[in-house]
């Protein structure tokens, strides 16, 4: 018998019908409405800000603006005059309090060489206060031209006609030194100030007995006596001890200073007197 081979056909599976989901359209209306409101709000703020700023500028420039300046207070002055300070500040009664530029006023006043520090305050409704700290000269620095120097070693003003010369004279400093090494030069000048302070406290030998203080960055300070113009070398620092040793012999040498070439006190335990 023959085997019967029956070919079996596999019936393809029936595909299921897919259910199509309908996508809902995006509702852009709330987003557009919110964005429009945001843009309108920002535009409104910008408009209000512009109006406020324009009004501020208008009021600050108006001659008879609200909140006029009525009182200008100036701190106590030693050398400067109140009217000169107010004139340099560039303010006057009737100016708008809103239009005052305090920083500009302070910068203008700081140009005055006699003014060390300045502070400007505004007190509503009608007051402006100007507080000034003046410079006090302690010496005259000879740099080809004569300049005043304050206690901080700052050279601040060239002398003009009418300025007092009744101050100790410092030499050995050039304008080029201030330009090339302002910090080092100022420190050296502060050393001269320290020496002058020590001399002011003296009894037998004082600042009045000194005609000149010479500054040398390498060798330090040398003072010149008013009697005979004798150089007394002091070097750098330790002025109290060096002056104390000098005073011990100054009484004996006072009458013979014309015969002395120089005195060197820049030693720890001795003094050299060089006679001419």
Swiss-Prot record:
Q: Where in the cell is it found?
A: Cell inner membrane
Repeat in keyword set: no
Q: Could you say which residues form the signal peptide?
A: none
GO biological process terms, alphabetically, are: division septum assembly; FtsZ-dependent cytokinesis
Pull the Cytoplasmic topological domain ranges from the record. 1-37
Q: Which UniProt keywords apply?
A: Cell cycle, Cell division, Cell inner membrane, Cell membrane, Membrane, Transmembrane, Transmembrane helix
Q: Where is the major localization of this protein?
A: membrane
May I have one GO cellular component term? plasma membrane
Q: Where is the POTRA domain?
A: 67-135
A Pfam family of the record is FtsQ_DivIB_C
Q: Which InterPro entries match?
A: Cell_div_FtsQ/DivIB_C, FtsQ, FtsQ_C_sf, POTRA, POTRA_FtsQ_type
Regions of this protein lying in the Periplasmic compartment: 61-276
Give TM segment ranges: 38-60
Q: How does it sit in the membrane?
A: Single-pass type II membrane protein
Q: What PANTHER family does UniProt report for this protein, alphabetically?
A: CELL DIVISION PROTEIN FTSQ
The protein's role, per its UniProt record:
Essential cell division protein.
Family stated for the protein in its record: Belongs to the FtsQ/DivIB family. FtsQ subfamily.
Name of protein: Cell division protein FtsQ
């Amino acid at each position: 018998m023959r085997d019967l081979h029956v070919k079996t056909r596999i019936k393809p599976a029936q595909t299921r019908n897919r259910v199509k989901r309908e996508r809902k359209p995006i509702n852009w209306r709330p987003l557009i409405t919110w964005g429009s409101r945001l843009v309108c709000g920002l535009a409104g703020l910008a408009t209000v800000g512009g109006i406020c700023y324009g009004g501020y500028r208008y009021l600050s420039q108006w001659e008879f603006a609200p909140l006029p300046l009525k009182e200008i207070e100036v701190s106590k002055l030693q050398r400067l005059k109140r009217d000169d300070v107010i004139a340099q500040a560039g303010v006057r009664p009737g100016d708008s309090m809103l239009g005052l530029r305090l920083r500009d006023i302070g910068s203008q006043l700081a140009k005055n060489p006699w003014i060390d520090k300045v502070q400007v305050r505004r007190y509503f409704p009608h007051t402006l206060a100007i507080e000034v700290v003046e410079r006090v000269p302690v010496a005259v620095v000879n740099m080809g031209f004569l300049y005043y120097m304050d206690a901080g070693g700052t050279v601040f003003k060239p002398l003009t006609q009418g300025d007092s010369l009744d101050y100790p004279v410092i030499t050995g400093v050039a304008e080029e030194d201030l330009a090339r090494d302002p910090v080092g030069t100022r420190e050296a000048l502060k050393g001269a100030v320290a020496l002058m302070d020590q001399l002011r406290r003296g009894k037998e030998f004082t600042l009045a007995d000194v005609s000149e203080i010479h500054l040398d960055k390498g060798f330090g300070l040398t003072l010149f006596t008013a009697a005979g113009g004798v150089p007394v070398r002091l070097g750098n620092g330790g002025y109290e001890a060096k002056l104390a040793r000098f005073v011990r012999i100054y009484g004996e040498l006072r009458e013979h200073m014309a015969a002395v070439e120089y005195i060197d006190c820049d030693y720890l335990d001795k003094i050299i007197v060089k006679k001419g």
